[in-house]
């Protein structure tokens, strides 16, 4: 189900019940995460410089050959290399196979050795039909591997260069099968992963040609490199915005067991690739989400958070955890109760991430906590009773804006019970007093002053809680003491009607003509 763009990027803070817009939020997150993922980890496409056959000697030669050369020289060499490949393909005499492999290897080296490989020149010279011909069934493994490697690096190029692989896709998919050698299958999976990383249209072509089942079966064995490559390609193939591929993947017998096994037992690099599959499954497939929860996914994710320091792994693990929290808060509550107040508890591992120096990690951890804090009164009490509270209050006053905003969602949600519709939420006064006493009000008023509409709304909502909920009517004085009146008055003629009405109503109600008259 593609997001229509109208859904909130997270459940509406303070006013909504847990899960109210969780499904929409998870689907939208799956659409946007691909861009973030490329920016943070440069993962959508990968140039292959060292092959999948484990040939160390070849890798060393490759490294020696990686010298900076003028682009025109590289392009001329690429054109010449394609012509030599064309001659080798046509040659039928003695040593024909070795002649083809030598020509393929030379083209592959040219497509691997530069930061900007001469892909366009190779395509103009007619490389694709020749590479497709070299992928034909019955060809020696060495020829298949070199051809798939060339196609992998072509697919890592510009969009139009990636699309040039369309004629090769059926054979690349066919070589994913069990009859292929592991290096050949892995190299073909790599090429397919690059194609899938280009965009939705090419993903749909791959799905229609049957790429998903053989790719999924490649993660069943415990073969590290093959599993990593196949899992990365799978995550590119299912990442949305449509849920069709995720729904198809979860129907493959044994796939969820394999995902859980690898997340639990494999090295961090493999677990990272598996975790990105979980991100998209938990965002796009309710069936997969339910089945993974039954398989104990939450505890596995928490265990990875507790034991890993790898940013590349922790980001998808946190993203997955937040998705599961949004869809099944009861499962999270069970774990909260069982492991409360320990470093290995869900709150403990999220606190660990909040203490990290990595900005993205802090933001992701705060987002997960905001999902938990938007749950039941039990969820809120469990968070409020832990060591994470002083940490959240400190972050609200010291961190960059985007992290402060995420933390503000946590603190705001801790102060109210979940409410349905337009009804004002009931304030949890004990939490509100504690959080305000911790010095958070200034941080929320700073959000009101920000140009970010979402943050300003959140700040105004919290001010309303303070004005309405602090005991002995002390809310207005507290807000005034932090220059909250001035912050709200900036909305007197604001173009956003919702914020204008909200701010003006609060000023009129709590700071009208009679304000301060009894002092």
Swiss-Prot record:
ARM repeat ranges per the UniProt record: 116-156, 158-197, 200-239, 244-283, 286-326, 335-374, 377-416, 429-468
Compartments, as annotated in UniProt: Nucleus envelope
UniProt cross-references to Gene3D superfamilies, sorted A to Z: Leucine-rich Repeat Variant (1.25.10.10)
Region annotation (Disordered) ranges: 1-29
UniProt keyword annotation of Transport present: yes
UniProt keyword annotation of Membrane present: no
GO biological process: protein import into nucleus
SMART domains: ARM
Keywords (A to Z) from UniProt: Nucleus, Protein transport, Repeat, Transport
InterPro entries: ARM-like, ARM-type_fold, Armadillo, Importin_alpha
This protein's GO CC annotations: cytoplasm; nuclear envelope
Gene Ontology MF, one: nuclear import signal receptor activity
Described purpose of this protein according to its UniProt entry: Binds to conventional NLS motifs and mediates nuclear protein import across the nuclear envelope. Acts as a cellular receptor for the nuclear import of the virD2 protein of Agrobacterium, but is not essential for Agrobacterium-mediated root transformation.
Family: Belongs to the importin alpha family.
Assembly and binders: Forms a complex with importin subunit beta-1.
Name the record gives this protein: Importin subunit alpha-9
């Amino acid at each position: 189900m593609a997001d229509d763009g109208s859904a909130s990027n997270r459940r509406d803070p303070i006013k909504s019940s847990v899960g109210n817009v969780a499904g929409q939020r998870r689907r939208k997150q799956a659409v946007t995460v691909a861009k973030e993922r490329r920016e943070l980890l440069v993962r959508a496409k990968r140039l292959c410089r060292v092959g999948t056959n484990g040939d160390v000697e070849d890798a060393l030669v490759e490294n020696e050959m990686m010298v900076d050369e003028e682009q025109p020289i590289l392009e001329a060499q690429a054109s010449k290399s394609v012509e030599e490949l064309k001659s080798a393909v046509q040659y039928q005499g003695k040593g024909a196979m070795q002649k083809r492999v030598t020509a393929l290897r030379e083209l592959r080296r040219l497509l691997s050795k530069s930061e900007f490989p001469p892909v366009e020149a190779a395509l103009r010279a007619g490389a694709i039909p020749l590479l497709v011909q070299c992928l034909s069934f019955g060809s020696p493994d060495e020829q298949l591997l070199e051809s798939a490697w060339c196609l992998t690096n072509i697919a890592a190029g510009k969009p139009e260069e990636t699309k040039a692989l369309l004629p090769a896709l059926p054979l690349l998919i066919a070589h994913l099968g069990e009859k292929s050698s592991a290096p050949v299958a892995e190299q073909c999976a790599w090429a397919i992963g690059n194609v899938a990383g280009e965009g939705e249209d090419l993903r749909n072509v791959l799905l229609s040609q049957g790429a998903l089942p053989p790719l999924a079966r490649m993660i069943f064995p415990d073969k590290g490199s093959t599993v990593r490559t196949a899992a990365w390609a799978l995550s590119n193939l299912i990442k949305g915005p449509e849920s069709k591929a995720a729904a198809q993947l979860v129907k493959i017998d044994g796939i969820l067991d394999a995902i859980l096994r690898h997340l639990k037992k494999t090295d961090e690099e493999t677990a990272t690739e598996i975790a990105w599959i979980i991100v998209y499954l938990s965002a796009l497939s309710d069936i997969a989400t339910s089945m993974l929860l039954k398989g104990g996914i939450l505890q596995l994710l928490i265990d990875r958070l507790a034991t890993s320091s790898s940013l590349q792994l922790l980001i998808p693990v946190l993203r997955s955890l937040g998705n599961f929290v949004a869809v099944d808060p009861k499962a999270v509550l069970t774990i909260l109760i069982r492991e409360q107040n320990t470093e290995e508890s869900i709150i403990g591992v999220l606190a660990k991430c909040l203490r990290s120096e990595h900005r993205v990690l802090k933001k992701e951890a705060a987002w997960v906590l905001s999902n938990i804090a938007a749950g039941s009164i039990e969820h809120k009490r469990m968070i409020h009773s832990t060591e994470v509270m002083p940490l959240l209050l400190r972050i609200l006053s010291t961190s960059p804006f985007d992290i402060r905003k995420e933390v503000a969602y946590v603190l705001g949600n801790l102060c109210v019970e979940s409410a349905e519709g337009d009804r004002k939420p009931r304030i949890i006064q004990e939490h509100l007093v504690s959080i305000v006493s911790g010095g958070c009000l200034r941080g929320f008023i700073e959000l009101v002053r920000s140009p970010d509409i979402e943050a300003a709304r959140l700040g105004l909502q919290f001010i309303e809680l303070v004005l309405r909920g602090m005991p002995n009517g002390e809310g207005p004085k507290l807000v005034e003491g932090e220059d909250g009146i001035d912050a709200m008055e900036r909305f007197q003629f604001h173009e956003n009607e919702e914020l204008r009405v909200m701010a003006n109503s609060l000023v009129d109600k709590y700071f009208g003509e009679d304000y301060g008259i009894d002092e």
